[in-house]
Amino acid sequence: MTIVLNTLETALPSEQIESLLADTDQQVKIIHTASMRIFHCIGCNQCWLKTPGQCAINDDYQQIIKQLVNAQNLWLVTDTKFGFLDYRGKRVMDRIMPMLNMYIEFRGGWMRHQLRYHALNVGVIYQGNGDQELLQEWSERCAMNLGGHSLGVHALSSLDETSPSCEVRKEMAS
């Protein structure tokens, strides 16, 4: 299953993404987070210590994390500020900590948290003046932390459904 977290105020990007993924046999779930009540991670580590796999913050993110447990791919659709994710995108990704375990292991020569569930592939679709290189490196590191691989980073403007590149379609469907 592929989860698309759309943090933008508009649903239009979700419609574009849905049409790009329509010819794949993957189940796609698009979640619009802009109107959801999602708080910032407070770094309490309760998701590791007191309530393993569950965030201590009782808000709308609980629905999202339950669906991420069953997903193989995560696409984050976000605006950018100062070349990076805006606060909505960053907030949604910071809350993914319950997917990990507090114990550390070496993977590919790097120290990483053990996975609580399974690997999750991560991709970013951004709007605005994002720093492509920075976002690509961030996506790769997030995916590595989650045991998966980067699905790529694409500007929303490059997803014109009338002429999407084969590469974008292939990455989104993987």
Label each PLM-derived region with a short phrase.
Residues 1-5, 73-75, 118-125, 149-153:
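Hydrophobic beta-strand segments of well-ordered beta-sheets in folded domains
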